[in-house]
Amino acid sequence: MKLPHPLIVLASALLLTALPAHAQQLSGVGHDAETAQLHPKEDPLAPVYVVTATESFERGVKALASKKTVQRNSLGQSLVVASMPAWRLDELSHYMHETEGRCGGYFAFDSQAEAVAFIHNDQGARGTSTTFSDYPINQRRVVNALMPQVQETNIRGTISALSAYQNRYYASAHGQNAAVWIRNMWQGLAAGRSDVTAELFTACSNCSTQPSVILTIRGAELPNEIVVLGGHLDSIRSGASGDPNMLAPGADDDASGIATLTEILRIAMANGYRPKRTIKFMGYAAEEVGLRGSRAIAQSFRTQGQNVVGVLQLDMTNWKSPGSTAALNLISDFANAPLKQFIRDLFTTYMAPRGFTMTESACGYACSDHASWTALGYPAVMYDEGPIFPSLHTPNDRLDQMGGTADHSVPLAQLGVAFMVELGKTRNAKPTPPIEPRPNPGNPRPGH
């Protein structure tokens, strides 16, 4: 790999620390044609059909919903299709957070027929168990050169920029502008590389006016094999009832995930990294209202027959719970078993020797965007910060409530660099000898 010109590195650093006061002015220009396919804000009184776990429905969701039907997915899990007015989705998210101690918890659809079809066509059994690729660890020279380049200041700058928006709610102008700002920032990091493209994904019928963002690094040798690294770009405040001007900074949820992705991308671009496989960085729209953006993308990939060999979800990376000693937490449920083992092997190889530890826990049905890929039969995995940040979905989800730094995101970004390189591989690189994975150093802990 060639080293970047110093001016490119400087430009990248300046871009990462730009404030959205400037970025909003830039992002609001010239994207009307790109977002014209998106639908306007939904009617708050219109019915929305949610798919959630039967146990969640019986514990409390039923108080918010009216009609219901019970179905089973390919994993044999009992699921409920229930209807409620759109404005009650905020209450549903609040229930999941406050009562079940987690995020997400449901998929959302415009019609009952869509919701039922989603369950009938579920491929979660395939997504969780099938080995889609060999996952050898043989890129140590490249990974060890790139991992130390993760900079806390860059991650902090992106968190600050995104959380300075009034909100990134999917049905607000702020949410659309934030998405365009991310696309422009990622595009700027590519510095005109011909094998890199950045686009707004607008083929989502229920994402309101918020697009998702996809940056693609075309694989040099295996372009039809795709690696995805993603996180959601929207934010929400509990109890706001869909107010487009709600105060929802979402610094941890999930500006931190987008910032961590951005730092991984910056390092790849600054070092001229060229993968064998195609790598896609994704910022998903409308995660907070039923995993809408990621489901639309995963569905489009399935319809097109795209070959995805691995998906990594980064959702909340920057809160370190008092008393916690682990660097990160691997999500154990609704994820691909071979890919989870790959994460364990990566951690053992690259993170444990640096003194880090990892926990594992379940997060429940549809807790984040990896669940969209799993349900469509793709191999997906997620790791996060660990115990849940108590200020999620409130105006206090701010960087200063997390110590004012992005220190906790650094090891998650470093592991993300390893995931990108070891799964994407490196063009024309002589692989290092594969290693025998050592036992997982983590200590599994109860779910949160």
Indicate residue ranges for each PLM-predicted region.
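Bacterial N-terminal signal peptides
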Residues: 8-18
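N-terminal hydrophobic or amphipathic helices/low-complexity stretches enriched
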Residues: 115-172
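Second-shell loop/turn segments in exported
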Residues: 141-150, 163-174, 199-203, 242-254, ...
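Structural recognition of the beta-strand scaffold that forms the well-ordered cores
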Residues: 155-163, 199-200, 212-216, 226-231, ...
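A non-catalytic alpha/beta surface segment that caps or lines the substrate-entry region
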Residues: 157-218
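Solvent-exposed loop/turn segments at secondary-structure junctions
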Residues: 167-170, 203-208, 219-222, 233-237, ...
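Acidic/histidine-rich catalytic neighborhood of metal-dependent amide-processing enzymes
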Residues: 209-212, 245-338, 342, 365-366
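Active-site-adjacent substrate-binding region
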Residues: 320-436
